[in-house]
Design a protein with these regions (language model features):
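Non-catalytic substrate-recognition/targeting regions of SAM-dependent transferases
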Residues: 7-22, 29-96, 103
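Conserved alpha-helix/loop element of class I SAM-dependent methyltransferases that forms part
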Residues: 96-112
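Conserved SAM-binding loop of SAM-dependent methyltransferases across substrates and taxa
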Residues: 125-137
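Conserved class I S-adenosyl-L-methionine
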Residues: 115-121
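S-adenosyl-L-methionine
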Residues: 150-188
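Conserved SAM-binding motif I beta-strand of class I
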Residues: 138-143
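Mobile active-site "lid"/loop adjacent to the S-adenosyl-L-methionine
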Residues: 146-148, 170, 187-199
Length: 210
């Protein structure tokens, strides 16, 4: 198992009764997590002094309850900066557990010692996009949500990557890939959430399966 243990601005403080107590930078959030099936005493003071609490509804979905939390704030991971804001389905705009993948991608790209072209599909707010761009890759970032692509651009700007070779595409990922195939465009690596696929079997030096 890979563990994302290089965070300084994120940590799981405690978890009990189907919920996680998390620190995101200077703020503490409580969010539901179905994998937390144990019932242990909630001794951490953050359980009583959180900045926001997402309450799951028995009918599906849920809603946030806020206690002194700004509309938006930022956290850092290495040289990267991410803008966070709570929205639907308990999300904050970042999956911190993916950092272990960002590090792996970055190491592979740097060790290639040549130009690397990456396609990031379902790219969300750009965590993987920024990581591989910072490592020196040229990136095509594709997501069907215009709002998410705009958010990813904001993260790029916050990370000092506004001028990095990133193509921002708002499109259906499957349709975009179909058009890229017809155009004859090739990539050294394709990222889909936490999955990695090799587009060129003759280039195992760039990224291979872990």
């Amino acid at each position: 198992m890979w563990i994302a243990n290089n965070w300084k601005d994120y940590e799981v403080i405690d978890c009990s009764c189907g919920e996680k107590l998390e620190r995101w930078g200077n703020y503490t959030l409580v969010r539901p997590d179905p994998q937390v099936i144990w019932d242990t005493p909630k001794k951490e003071k953050g359980w009583k002094h959180m900045n926001a609490h997402y309450h799951r509804s028995k009918k599906g979905g849920g809603e946030w309850e806020f206690f002194d939390l700004p509309e938006q704030w930022s956290i850092h991971y290495g040289s990267l900066t991410f803008q966070l804001k709570p929205f639907s389905f308990k999300h904050t705009g970042l999956f911190p557990e993916q950092a272990v993948n960002w590090d792996w991608f970055s190491d592979k790209i740097r060790s290639a010692k040549r130009p690397v072209k990456v396609l990031n599909l379902f790219a969300y707010t750009g965590g993987a996009t920024l990581a591989v761009a910072a490592a020196g890759a040229s990136v095509t970032h594709v997501d069907a949500s215009k709002g998410m692509v705009t958010w990813a651009k904001e993260n790029a700007a916050s990370s000092g990557l506004s001028d990095a070779p990133i193509r921002w595409i708002v499109d259906d990922c499957v349709k975009f890939v179909e058009r890229e195939i017809r155009r004859g465009n090739h990539y050294d690596a394709i990222i889909m959430l936490s999955l990695i696929h090799i587009s060129e079997p003759t280039r195992p030096d760039v990224i291979s399966y872990a």
